[in-house]
Amino acid sequence: MTGYKRVSEMTLEEKREKVAGFNVMDDVFFQKMMEDKEVCEEILRIILENSKMRVIECVPQASIKNLNGKSVVLDVLCRDNDGKYCNVEVQKADDDDHQKRVRYNAALISMYTMQAGKDYKELPDVKVVFISQFDVFKADHAMYHVDRVVRETGQKVENGQSEIYVNAKVKDQTSVSELMEYFTDSNGRKEICPKLSNRVMMFKTEQKEVTEICELMEKERLAGWEEGKEEGKQGERIRLIVNLVDKMGMSFEDACRFMEIPQEEIEEYRRKAKL
């Protein structure tokens, strides 16, 4: 890449070239895929191994306030035909305690969906599906179901909350593994997920959708840039630079220049970013 161009300065072919490298695992791309309720339903039917489940409501970037009034944004929150809730999260980097993130999300959804004056037995079931590029439990399975078990008896007990961890690292020839392959290499149309792959190709080829994706990426990048300038922290700037390289296809030098990193500090940033 020889220099940074704003979306308004790019030709359609340049936009298509940029979008061609995006995958379903990328935050903004995943968000656009989940705006289609039928696509969300297709994905969940494969992961939950339930071909009859129906998604009644699907909200990408669902915002829920915690007890302190701070808004937490979920990647997508769905409600099915049985009134059960399902939060789907996608994660590329192994950089946090993901099990605690799942626990936190489930608690927020339970608080959000519990109506005042109702008995606990009326609390809706909550499922969190955590999709990652890495194997959270490092046990060579493409999918893990986490159950509550009584230690003394080995009995499985239910409280309406469940967790499923799916990863794209382990290839085991299952339907879930095949779906995950498409999440990380989102090109062409895939028989196992026709609705998802059709929508992917629409956003990678059609002028309106290609431009929309590019503009969303630019908006996210500019918001991150302002955040980095306001914070003034080197660690935050490094994270944003890495995002520019990974998600926007910028060279490391162009990303540093965009973040207004002095020329004499670029090598230090490169070393700390490990790029």
Task: List the predicted regions and their residue ranges.
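Accessory alpha/beta interaction modules
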Residues: 1-159, 172-174, 227
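Short, charged alpha-helical interaction segments and adjacent helix-coil junctions
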Residues: 2-20, 24, 28, 86-91, ...
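Short, well-ordered beta-strand micro-motif
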Residues: 130, 165-167
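Low-complexity, glycine/alanine/valine/leucine- and proline-rich hydrophobic stretches
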Residues: 150-159, 167-169, 179, 183-186
